[in-house]
Swiss-Prot record:
Name listed for the protein in its UniProt record: Disintegrin and metalloproteinase domain-containing protein 28
Gene name per UniProt: ADAM28
Skewed-composition ranges (Basic and acidic residues): 690-700
Chain span(s) of sequence motif Cysteine switch: 167-174
InterPro entries: ADAM_Cys-rich, Disintegrin_CS, Disintegrin_dom, Disintegrin_dom_sf, EGF-like_dom, MetalloPept_cat_dom_sf, Peptidase_M12B, Peptidase_M12B_N
Disulphide bridges, residue numbers: C315-C394, C354-C378, C356-C361, C465-C485, C629-C639, C633-C645, C647-C656
């Protein structure tokens, strides 16, 4: 046989008819990847069984006449904790399962000894996926359905010569319609600076949910296993791309509409996106927690559009996108998925001002032809700016070790059950506190990570690990027993904020002024109170609640809790609907009635000690049950938003009756008091000696009348040296000491970091905006 005559690593220039010719691929060759087995493995296992549990793999092949070793590491972040799959039986009944995915064969990696290289590979049935070597990119696919070591693979060399704009993103045109400019940050009218975070250094976690329509189900012969493998490979590639932004993309669930579509899907991308967004809000969000959902459809979208998403809406009710399955090459579809997700992060299409480190970047408008491998400078800037928005907090919730359902693997940079830490492989690990081989904390050390871990030791109890960001936040302190900072806590709901103009609610300070600014932009003011009387009318221009299609008018006491009325600002809104103005009053009537755009938010102040709750103006006590909650806390503690007692800054949890400030105070007193006594005694001795010397200088020899003066010999004076122990026994003169009871008060240096005065910052926090700024 030919294979027996040639080295298995030899690359043959042979045409392979079994593989479709791909756009941008001029030729393909055959290669026989050989798996390099680690020498330290002692257990003899079948190749399939061994690979199923291998954390790392290496394959050797010849590329351009040189031996190359492809290093692969299992992507354990592909599936999030609690991953579920949903489908429907023939009667339309919803069935949700939590399958144990046995084909754990999705890897990422690179070519060893290459400065620029990455890879996204599936090893389920041979090697299938993408890898790069320097500036050259390759696609690899098996030629045989039989999985064995050394089997032949097709290696595609990807050399695009020119751009093809046959398929694009549906965002073009929409951008300009809303008067936005590409690669310019949106006005931060509702943004809260996360000054205590270095966004680039913190890992982010995207909980990703994918829905496949009925057309997709039929396209892949109603084979759920085939669909699952394709989806996992696409998600693996999306994850590889976003890891370049220090962000993990993990699937929390997949849904296949096996019986029929749950929404109306048409070639109109905007219409389909709106329908999917409504379904997600009314059905999916109530069933499954996630950060973003995308619909993969087999329907061919109108024109050249293959994807559409709402702009800058991650972590909001409009964090959705629609992607057409426009190519047999799943990596091209994965590139579109990453592209539309980028729009959710506020990324615009790349233009001439953007620098791309590779041939093509994720936010290029030519979606279907190119397969992106990196993010441009503009995309990275937009991504960083997005994290100035408090809505982005949903991306910092890393999975707990107890929630991870996969088998713990040391070296995957994910702390799992039984592990103290996981800093990657021995080559990757930079954490001096963690043993990379065992994923345990090194001997004599207490911790390896966390805000309360410093130089591998726990920080002292009472030290602030997360300062209060604003007046509706609470500082968190270390407890001296863990390296982790406690969960973020907020001021008790109803706490006054913004100089009494609002009351805190879940860490925000909702006010009418902030909501007007969010809706209409800078320069907006709250309309006169007389405008709010229109809410008693019960028309679409003023009401309190909507029940089905019926508008419920406000009661006289609730008029400040219905429609939001403002004046001034811009009339250029990113939502469909009507702008209604009369006198100096302005409000918005949205076309989409499923979202309460232009309504006064819950928690907004509507009177003295009153807030809006579900369109009613109620007492704070009725709304939050928080009156006098802090009086029930022991020690120096206050109530938080969940009516739990939290220590005030500077007081040690959990009892909050011991302060590190008192500890430092006692040290200061113990050291300074003896020194002060010694100083006073020494000063008095010096003063006494100086006084005697002065008296001697003032003395003159006495003369008898009529007698010549004569010289007198001065008798030398002996000065006794005072030893330290004798100095302490000397008694100063009474007049050198203050009279008892008239001493000045003791003054000690105040540690302003430990006990700051209560200051209400003029820095209000906005409520998350429940709107869909679509670009």
């Amino acid at each position: 046989m030919l294979q027996g005559l040639l080295p298995v690593s030899l690359l043959l220039s042979v045409a392979v008819s079994a593989i479709k010719e791909l756009p941008g691929v001029k030729k393909y060759e055959v290669v026989y990847p050989i798996r390099l087995h680690p020498l330290h493995k002692r257990e003899a296992k079948e190749p399939e069984q061994q690979e199923q549990f291998e954390t790392e793999l290496k394959y050797k092949m010849t590329i351009n006449g040189k031996i190359a070793v492809l290093y692969l590491k299992k992507n354990k972040n592909l599936l999030a904790p609690g991953y579920t799959e949903t489908y429907y039986n023939s009667t339309g009944k919803e069935i949700t399962t939590s399958p144990q995915i046995m084909d754990d064969c999705y890897y990422q990696g690179h070519i060893l000894n290459e400065k620029v290289s990455d890879a996204s590979i599936s090893t389920c049935r041979g090697l299938r996926g993408y890898f790069s070597q320097g500036d050259q990119r390759y696609f690899i696919e098996p030629l045989s359905p039989i999985h064995r070591d050394g089997q032949e693979h097709a290696l595609f060399k990807y050399n695009p010569d020119e751009k093809n704009y046959d398929s694009t993103c549906g965002m073009d045109g929409v951008l300009w319609a809303h008067d936005l400019q590409q690669n310019i940050a949106l006005p931060a009218t509702k943004l809260v600076k996360l000054k205590d975070r270095k966004v680039q250094e913190h890992e982010k976690y995207i909980e990703y949910y994918l829905v496949l329509d009925n057309g997709e189900f039929k396209r892949y012969n109603e084979n759920q296993d085939e669909i699952r493998k394709r989806v996992f490979e696409m998600a693996n590639y999306v994850n590889m791309l976003y890891k370049k932004l220090n962000t993990h993309v993990a699937l929390v669930g997949m849904e296949i509409w096996t019986d029929k579509d749950k929404i109306k899907i048409t070639p109109n991308a905007s219409f389909t996106l709106e329908n999917f967004s409504k379904w997600r809000g009314s059905v999916l969000s109530r069933r499954k927690r996630h950060d973003i959902a995308q619909l993969i459809t087999a329907t061919e979208l109108a024109g050249t559009t293959v994807g559409l998403a709402f702009m800058s809406t991650m972590c909001s009710p409009y964090s959705v996108g629609v992607v057409q399955d426009h190519s047999d090459n799943l990596l091209r579809v994965a590139g579109t998925m990453a592209h539309e997700m980028g729009h959710n992060f506020g990324m615009f299409h790349d233009d001439y001002s953007c620098k791309c480190p590779s041939t093509i970047c994720v936010m290029d408008k030519a979606l279907s032809f190119y397969i992106p491998t990196d993010f441009s400078s503009c995309s990275r800037l937009s991504y960083d700016k997005f994290f100035e928005d408090k809505l982005s907090n949903c991306l910092f919730n890393a999975p707990l070790p107890t929630d991870i359902i996969s088998t713990p693997i040391c070296g995957n940079q994910l702390v799992e059950m039984g592990e103290d830490c996981d800093c990657g492989t021995s080559e990757e690990c930079t954490n001096i506190c963690c043993d990379a081989k065992t994923c345990k904390i090194k001997a004599t050390f207490q911790c390896a990570l966390g805000e309360c871990c410093e130089k591998c030791q726990f920080k002292k109890a009472g030290m602030v690990c997360r300062p209060a960001k604003d007046e509706c936040d609470l500082p968190e302190m270390c407890n001296g027993k863990s390296g982790n900072c406690p969960d973020d806590r907020f001021q008790v709901n109803g706490f006054p904020c913004h100089h009494g103009k609002g009351h805190c609610l879940m860490g925000t300070c909702p006010t009418l002024q902030e909501q007007c600014t969010e809706l209409w932009g800078p320069g907006t003011e709250v309309a006169d109170k007389s405008c709010y009387n229109r809410n008693e009318g019960g028309s679409k221009y003023g009401y309190c609640r909507r029940v089905d299609d019926t508008l419920i008018p406000c009661k006289a006491n609730d008029t400040m809790c219905g429609k939001l009325f403002c004046q001034g600002g811009s009339d250029n809104l990113p939502w469909k609907g009507r702008i209604v103005t009369f006198l100096t009053c302005k409000t918005f009537d949205p076309e989409d009635t499923s979202q309460e755009i232009g309504m006064v938010a819950n928690g907004t102040k509507c009177g003295d000690n009153k807030v809006c709750i579900n369109a009613e103006c109620v007492d704070i006590e009725k709304a939050y049950k928080s009156t006098n909650c802090s009086s029930k806390c022991k020690g120096h503690a206050v109530c938080d938003h969940e009516l739990q007692c939290q220590c005030e800054e500077g007081w040690i949890p959990p009892d909050c009756d011991d302060s590190s400030v008192v500890f430092h105070f006692s040290i200061v007193v113990g050291v300074l008091f003896p020194m002060a006594v010694i100083f006073v005694v020494v000063a008095m001795v010096i003063r006494h000696q100086s006084s005697r010397e002065k008296q001697k200088k003032d003395q003159r020899p006495l003369s008898t009348t009529g007698t010549r003066p004569h010289k007198q010999k001065r008798k030398p004076q002996m000065v006794k040296a005072v030893q330290p122990q004798e100095m302490s026994q000397m008694k100063p003169h009474v007049y050198d000491l203050p009279v008892e009871g008239n001493e000045p008060p003791a003054s000690f240096h105040k540690d302003t970091n430990a006990l700051p005065p209560t200051v209400f910052k003029d820095n209000p926090v906005s409520t998350p905006k429940d709107s869909n700024p679509k670009a």
